[in-house]
């Protein structure tokens, strides 16, 4: 290891130990100093003081409301969201390998129904016993929860305006 010399007190930690250290001269390839210039007391910015908030001041709900009414766009968006779940949704059942095939694969269901209704309907069409298992997957990708809305699934995962539900009697995907 090199020992620090009087010309180069930093020793080997310097990026270029063999070049003499320049004092007072700024080279164009070196970054500027990170020290902030001294400011006058007139130009120095003071920190913004924190407001004193009393935790004991009761605030009513009406005082905390920012908007008195919803904007028109929000009303329209809410109306559109409610309208989606009022119609009918087309569901196409796709059998996975080793699953029984339905004679009619396309059915309509109310968009406001839960996915549980789809599974119960499929079990009835397949003449399943209470002990038989049916595994359903949307677009052969994921198994939705039984409490998921059919309208929301259709809106997010539809293919050619149909909700594709693949089914199997054994687990098909990990």
From Swiss-Prot:
Cross-link Glycyl lysine isopeptide (Gly-Lys) (interchain with K-163 in atg5) per UniProt, renumbered positions: 174
Q: How does it sit in the membrane?
A: Peripheral membrane protein
Ordered alphabetically, the record's keywords are: Autophagy, Isopeptide bond, Membrane, Protein transport, Transport, Ubl conjugation pathway
| Main location as per UniProt | membrane
Q: What residue spans carry the region label Disordered?
A: 1-56
Q: Which GO terms describe its biological process?
A: autophagosome assembly; autophagosome maturation; autophagy of mitochondrion; glycophagy; piecemeal microautophagy of the nucleus; protein transport
Q: Where is the composition biased (Polar residues)?
A: 8-26
What does the record give under GO molecular function? Answer: protein tag activity
Q: Where in the cell is it found?
A: Preautophagosomal structure membrane
Matching entries from InterPro entries are given as:
Atg12 (IPR007242), Ubiquitin-like_domsf (IPR029071)
Q: Name one GO cellular component term.
A: autophagosome membrane
Subunit arrangement? Forms a conjugate with atg5.
Q: What does this protein do?
A: Ubiquitin-like protein involved in cytoplasm to vacuole transport (Cvt), autophagy vesicles formation, mitophagy, and nucleophagy. Conjugation with atg5 through a ubiquitin-like conjugating system involving also atg7 as an E1-like activating enzyme and atg10 as an E2-like conjugating enzyme, is essential for its function. The atg12-atg5 conjugate functions as an E3-like enzyme which is required for lipidation of atg8 and atg8 association to the vesicle membranes.
Family, per the entry? Belongs to the ATG12 family.
Q: What is this protein called?
A: Ubiquitin-like protein ATG12
